[in-house]
From Swiss-Prot:
Residues 154-183 are annotated as: Disordered. Keywords: Calcium, Lipoprotein, Membrane, Metal-binding, Methylation, Palmitate, Prenylation, Repeat. Belongs to the calmodulin family. Ca(2+) 2 binds at residues 56, 58, 60, 62, 67. GO terms for molecular function: calcium ion binding; enzyme regulator activity. This is Calmodulin-like protein 3. The gene is CML3. InterPro entries: CALM/Myosin/TropC-like, EF-hand-dom_pair, EF_Hand_1_Ca_BS, EF_hand_dom. Residues 181-183 form a propeptide. It comes from the Eukaryota. It is a lipid-anchor. GO terms for cellular component: cytoplasm; membrane. Signal peptide: none annotated. It comes from Oryza sativa subsp. japonica (Rice).
């Protein structure tokens, strides 16, 4: 937890203790949602379940404070990653209308010295365009990018990424130290 400040740890301890009803040093998965809400987060039930599964090694449904700190540290990193992803979206969205069109995607990829074939472009759009309107809105972009980021972190690849299902490697689309990966 080196990357958390003393103030953050104290704030998280205070929130944790508020919901540790019996003072045994653990909170239940249901209480976790309340704690996250008090810290300005609003995870869904599915997200809460996944968070608990990630940290609750014994499957008890309870989380100890150290596990809770790890969970919040990851959540804070993801929030920082969202800022990076928002910046990346702006790079792709040339006309700043809130959508990445096929032409904008092709243009940015060509400027990255990696032009897309029509099939690659179609694959990338298909993967990201969940509402089927032929373009990528910010929420679609965020969903794909965060999923890629989590996958890369789980695989131990840091901030690099890969493209769609065709396995062409590409990393750092928006800068050498960026968490941005190509769709």
């Amino acid at each position: 937890m080196d990357h958390l400040t003393k103030e953050q740890i104290a704030e998280f301890r205070e929130a944790f203790n508020l919901f540790d009803k019996d003072g045994d040093g653990t909170i239940t998965s249901k209480e976790l949602g309340t704690v996250m809400g008090s810290l300005g987060q609003s995870p869904t039930e599915a997200e809460l379940k996944k968070m608990v599964e990630e940290v609750d090694a014994d499957g008890s449904g309870s989380i100890e404070f150290e596990e809770f700190l790890g969970l919040l540290a990851r959540k804070l990193r993801d929030t920082g990653a969202e800022d990076d992803i928002r910046d990346a979206f702006r790079v792709f969205d040339k006309d700043q209308n809130g959508f990445i069109t096929p032409d904008e995607l092709r243009h940015v990829m060509a400027n990255l010295s990696d032009p897309l074939s029509d099939d690659e472009l179609a694959d990338m759009l298909h993967e990201a365009d969940s509402d089927g309107d032929g373009q990528i809105n910010y929420n679609e972009f965020l969903k794909v990018m965060m999923a890629k980021r989590r996958q890369n972190m789980m695989e131990g690849h840091g901030s690099g990424g890969h493209r769609s299902s065709n396995s062409h490697k590409k990393s750092g689309c928006c800068g050498p130290n960026s968490s941005c990966t190509i769709l």
